[in-house]
């Protein structure tokens, strides 16, 4: 098992031999959609910065710490900032992404997913909340399979049909026992939540803006801030209080 197609990747992009679902896809003036994300630097600060123009969690300097990972694509001139804020008292990490065009030409952002998480196995159940008008938030739980399983909305709002939340948990997990990962998008527009199991039995979870009909034009010097995802991981054992 070698190569991009089975490696755990923190922020997967298109056109780099990872054929699973990407977190970001662009289109330049020549029709090129490939994008390589290289690490450049990082910064750790107390507290949590505000997200421009978006609702988000908030914290004082003593309630959270934020890690910013600075990446870049040498071909397009895009700078990508991955932001992680840790809330120790709540076992919560929030994630968001900002993309800035530092190149010489305009570029279109065709896909920007706030969170991508690669897990080393596939024996999970997926839990989602579905419904309809006046009958929202019904729990659905099923074992994930090879391929893609997703929830989404493309109506411009999160909608009553699917909630912008999902969880992955052990097959035997309950409210009191087992391992579970939860993900919620702090955004009321169109969204996509997807879980993909690749050929090597590894799981990729993604949550963010729905790429359906999405395109954001970035002139040189402009940036785009993606909404925030709240993540939590719970591990309950028989000895847990």
PLM feature spans:
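Conserved small/polar residues in nucleotide/adenosyl-binding loops
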Residues: 236-241
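Short coil/turn motifs at secondary-structure junctions
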Residues: 102, 233-234
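Polysaccharide-binding surfaces and accessory modules of carbohydrate-active proteins
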Residues: 1-197, 202, 212-214
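Nucleotide/phosphate-binding site architecture used for ATP/NTP-dependent chemistry
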Residues: 205, 209
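Short Pro-Gly-centered flexible turn/kink motifs
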Residues: 216-233
